[in-house]
Amino acid sequence: MKYLFFLMCSVFLFGLQAQMNQTDAKGKKQGSWQKTYPNSSVLIYQGSFKDDQPIGVFNYYFPDGALKAKIEHGLPGGKSAVQLYFDNGQVLSDGFYKQEKKDSLWFNYAQSGELMSAENYKNDLLNGKALYYYKEGQVLEHKLQVERRVQYLDGKLHGKYQSYFYNGKLKQEGSYERGLKQGLWSEYNSKGVLIGTMKYVNDFLHGWVTTYDEAGNVLNKTLYLDGQKLSEKELTIYLSNCKARNIKPVE
């Protein structure tokens, strides 16, 4: 009787396996598919295809069998909902794919569960606004505190940049153009008081770097040209040349 039961189970399982990993006459994947790691019964993935295109939910696994990723295909706009996992089961990231590339809003987490960033993607590149968070506040105070607020264009920093102290006060602000610092940048202390200003051209300091005390008095001024700091002698020569040629010095 036991032998008969075992035989029936074997036939049933064999029948299930025979229905998996099928292709049609044109070689296109159809129906349920799964793949295992070499020399192992542990699945790499399992899901379903229709005319060679993934449909429904696909699950992917680590070599130890823990869930690595879950992707739900067939959402409006040609998108797929994605959840990626650490090997301890915590969510690593969740967002969307479009044509197998990151798209729209993605949330990223620490292995201990804290939200670390919220980023926008287009064609697998960072595009638009992105927020980055302090981990400590979520652990100690259950508070979500922004560390940086930035913007991207085609994977490069582009637009307004702001960073913050843990207490929420502005720490630094300026602008990027395609990954390079440009224009006026300002720095503040943890009380929110301006303590420094500087200008950049194509990621190089170019102009006066000025530091202030908390009362707003100038502590120091240093001139940079194309990233090079001018010594007192070089500064004197530069200003004399500008005056002689009736040229306005850089600001």
Segments from the language model and where they lie:
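Glycine/tyrosine- and acidic-biased, solvent-exposed loop/turn segments at the edges of beta-strands
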Residues: 16-251
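Bacterial Sec-dependent N-terminal signal peptides
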Residues: 1-21
